[in-house]
Amino acid sequence: MKHKSVLLEETILGLNVKPGGTYIDGTLGYAGHSGEVLKRLEEKGFLFAFDQDEEAVKYSTEKLSKIGSNFKIFHTNFKNMLEYVNTPVDGIMFDLGVSSPQLDETDRGFSFHNDAKLDMRMDKRQELDAYKVVNLYSYTDLVDILFNYGEEVNAKSIAKGIINSRPINTTLE
């Protein structure tokens, strides 16, 4: 897996990793940032990591295991972290958004360049996918999503275009 972590040095510098500290990576991804944190931790230090992408969890578990054993990965969204971590931490990091592997793997349904079934689920255990949102949500719901989450000023015209183009089955439609 070839993946270049964004702002890696700046993130590690900003965390000011203490060898015996406890850290959380809320968006593990392919463990670029977590790997660097784990390299700086001694036996007393610990890393908790969260990701909802099963493929990322599998890959990162193997990658981090080659660096150390003082970590725990949870296959869940970071919004659930308080259910799993009840200890003080010295630092926490998030790298929000899709990762390049998610965009590159056509069958994930995130691609801007390759045609694939419209999916866009980071967690394949979730029933709701992009196909259902695009094809079943009301005009009002689409406008709300585009405006509130995408900060899209043309939300109304885009939502109208989506409604008029239904059904939409693939990423390039």
Where are the regions that the model predicts?
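S-adenosyl-L-methionine-dependent methyltransferase catalytic core, i.e., the SAM/SAH-binding region
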Residues: M1-E173
